[in-house]
Amino acid sequence: MKTRLRVLRAEKEWSQAELAAHVGVARGTINAIETGKYDPSLPLAFKIARAFGKNVEEVFLYPEEQD
């Protein structure tokens, strides 16, 4: 799943560790989400979106459906 985490973190000047602390996970979890190696649970996705003051859909981008 693609995300806007790097862009949003840059806007707030947050490191991965700072975002991780805000949402209660390890820095490695944020790294794995950003690199597409891990899809967050729904509760974690909401926590991350809330940390940025965004809706989940503004942070996590669903791949386009293919015919």
Spans of features found by a protein language model:
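DNA major-groove recognition helix of helix-turn-helix/homeodomain DNA-binding modules
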Residues: P43-E58
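Short basic helix-loop element that most often maps to the first helix and adjoining turn
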Residues: T3-H22
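Short, basic-rich loop-to-helix N-cap that marks the start of a DNA-contacting helix
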Residues: K37-K47, E65-Q66
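Recognition helix of helix-turn-helix/homeodomain-like DNA-binding domains
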Residues: V25-Y38
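Residues in the helix-turn-helix
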Residues: E18, T29, E58
